[in-house]
Amino acid sequence: KNWAVLVAGSNGWPNYRHHA
């Protein structure tokens, strides 16, 4: 789940949900 935190912190929460 480290990648999720990195993406969410880099692009934002919306990006994390889109990736998931």
UniProtKB/Swiss-Prot annotation:
UniProt keywords, alphabetically? Hydrolase, Protease, Thiol protease
Question: A Pfam family matched by this chain, by name?
Answer: Peptidase_C13
| Enzyme Commission identifier(s) | 3.4.22.34
What is the enzyme's main class?
hydrolase
Reactions it catalyzes: Hydrolysis of proteins and small molecule substrates at -Asn-|-Xaa- bonds
Can you cite a GO biological process for this protein? proteolysis
Molecular function (Gene Ontology), one example:
cysteine-type endopeptidase activity
Keyword Nucleus assigned: no
The record's family statement is: Belongs to the peptidase C13 family.
- Its recorded name reads Hemoglobinase-like protein 1
Report the source organism: Fasciola hepatica (Liver fluke)
Q: What is the lineage of its organism?
A: Eukaryota, Metazoa, Spiralia, Lophotrochozoa, Platyhelminthes
